[in-house]
Amino acid sequence: LLRYSNPIITADYPDPDVIRVGKDFYMVSSSFNYFPGVPIMHSTDLVNWELINYVIAEPVAGFNKVRSGEGAWACSIRYHKGIFYCLIPFPDEGLFVSVSIDPYGKWSKLKCLYEGKGYEDPCPIWIDDKTYVVFAFVKSRIGFNSKLGLIETDETLSAVLSDNYSIIYDGTEKDQTIEGPKVYKIGKMIYILAPAGGVEHGYQVGLSSRSIMGPFRRSVLLKQGDNGINGPHQGALIDIDDKKRYAFIHFEDQKELGRVVMLEPADIDCNGNIKLGINSLPVRDGVVLTKEDARSIDYSDSFDSDKLSLIWQTPAIVEAGWINPSKNGLVMNSRFQSLDDFISFPYRLCQKVSSYHQKASLILDLFLDEGDKMLFGIIGRSYLLIGVKKSRGKLYRIIATVNQEEVIDEITGTNGIILDVKYDYPNLCSCSENKKSVMIDKEHWTGLHYCIGLITHNSSSRGFAVLKRFTISK
């Protein structure tokens, strides 16, 4: 057996959903306004995960600007009759579907299944000859929450057959903010697992019935204990083999770092009761399947491919041509923005901060025009950036935060420039230049990312940089 320690993924992969197909496990998670959207990961042991693809590869209307926190919320993945289905909510647009016969291959363009504001966390289920989708509600969009809704669809999730949604569970009294439902049919029973009570201090609710319409028997399956693991939020029940063995994967809120992924033991007893964790409490360590040819997410990048590594995303849809990957480095072209605001700047490569304590270094060659700023750093709802700007014909090394830009020194060389930043959990970002550090707080930082961008105030700039290597170290 493989021993593991939680979290199994120390990076911001919120709202994970996981399925098993044969000996393979596939995970999807929320991506919000980052594109490509909805990452897909693969594992053979539930502990070691490799990033293999994204569901959303094509542009989505309305996301050519940075819309922080919007976009693709908690999705679900299912496998039915040889087809992978991913059901994705956009809280301001509706519930969307993408399908594929190969999770490593091309996924279909998003199709709206159920249009409207305020629907979130959809999960499909096929029961006998009918197909249903269970979902939750976003109070800020629709005026209420704490309820679970249901619609009937055709078998391929192409059309809604219901005249309207039905409320199948009302958690207003016992389970405030119940959301994130995942629905399963095991034997003759229907099970819905859903978190309630809020992200940081909530618990996992189990609902069971012989009918998708209820009535449901309610129980609390997983709750916060005294071992420092906060509210066990939404996730997935997984049948880990054909021997009726189970596991549960969920996220835990880790402040500025984001929502990390946790693995819990699970079981269904002879009376059909689901058991999660140990005595309904999350675990720090456990054992699971035998380790098989384990791979992991590679966060470093040598920029020696003509394709961009899967680890990089952008915070909005941007046009092709602003970057050009090659075997000799990745060329990043400058892009104009009048405001000196890096958060709203869409032309930046981003990847998740992936450890409680780590250093990230970027090596690059610079070919800047007047008014260009090459910036690298850590960004959430605020940022700490180190970089180089060209002003009055000279190059200056700079450090920038939201409210301040500081010139460190003038530089003369343009090749082999090294920029580095460091993150120390829970609330410190720093860079070695001038030993600059910034205390961060969750009001302004969430789901931290490393980011790289070349912004300019010169509308005729033809400046560019060649990225040579990005390295993660302790």
Tell what function each PLM region has.
Residues L1-K474:
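Carbohydrate-active catalytic/glycan-binding domains of CAZyme proteins
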